[in-house]
Amino acid sequence: MLENPLIQQVLFEIMDEDVVGFDVLSVLINTNEVTDDEISRQLDVKLNNIRRILYKLYEARLVDYNREKDEETNWYTYTWKPSLEKVPALVAKKMKNVLNGLKEQLNVEENNMFFFCSDCEIKFTFEDAMDSGFRCPQCGEMMYEYDNKKDISLLKEQIKYLEDEFNKNPLFSTY
């Protein structure tokens, strides 16, 4: 399941783009139950970094933990275990959010006229361009009508790709 690029992307975002998170997940999957200290030693990564990743995964409900108190030291030991059955639903939710955002952007692109400042490389809606007298508010240069056919085409390709991935991937058949 972790080999799926869509799942990897969502996990990467959950872990704040920290690639060590995949190593943490691998340790959890391979051992099924392990302390944060053991993960830290096994990966030779600072304990604080391991805990930060585990907390992010816990917030997404992708790991669970048990807490036990050492009667001699009064310290707590946290034993972590993977809870990856929620991954497909999480990825499906993220994909739907991305798809909705792309569809909204496509709607904006298809139903508006745009102008462009070639110096600043900023795109403006017709209304914004008109409000500034068709001069760039950043640099004062004249704006030109922007042909957004390529943008529309790219958005349609991205939407089709995500919809195809979503429909053909057996992980998401129930979502």
Curated annotation (Swiss-Prot):
GO terms for biological process: regulation of DNA-templated transcription; transcription initiation at RNA polymerase II promoter. PROSITE patterns: HTH_TFE_IIE. The keyword Lipid biosynthesis does not apply. It comes from the Archaea. One of its GO terms (molecular function) is DNA binding. Pfam families: TFIIE_alpha (PF02002). Residues 3-88 form the HTH TFE/IIEalpha-type domain. InterPro entries: TF_E_archaea, TFE, TFIIE/TFIIEa_HTH, TFIIE_asu, TFIIEa/SarR/Rpc3_HTH_dom, WH-like_DNA-bd_sf, WH_DNA-bd_sf. Keywords: DNA-binding, Transcription, Transcription regulation. NCBIfam families: PRK06266.1, transcription factor E. Transcription factor that plays a role in the activation of archaeal genes transcribed by RNA polymerase. Facilitates transcription initiation by enhancing TATA-box recognition by TATA-box-binding protein (Tbp), and transcription factor B (Tfb) and RNA polymerase recruitment. Not absolutely required for transcription in vitro, but particularly important in cases where Tbp or Tfb function is not optimal. It dynamically alters the nucleic acid-binding properties of RNA polymerases by stabilizing the initiation complex and destabilizing elongation complexes. The winged helix domain is involved in binding to DNA in the preinitiation complex. Belongs to the TFE family. Monomer. Interaction with RNA polymerase subunits RpoF and RpoE is necessary for Tfe stimulatory transcription activity. Able to interact with Tbp and RNA polymerase in the absence of DNA promoter. Interacts both with the preinitiation and elongation complexes. This is Transcription factor E. It comes from Methanococcus maripaludis (strain DSM 14266 / JCM 13030 / NBRC 101832 / S2 / LL).
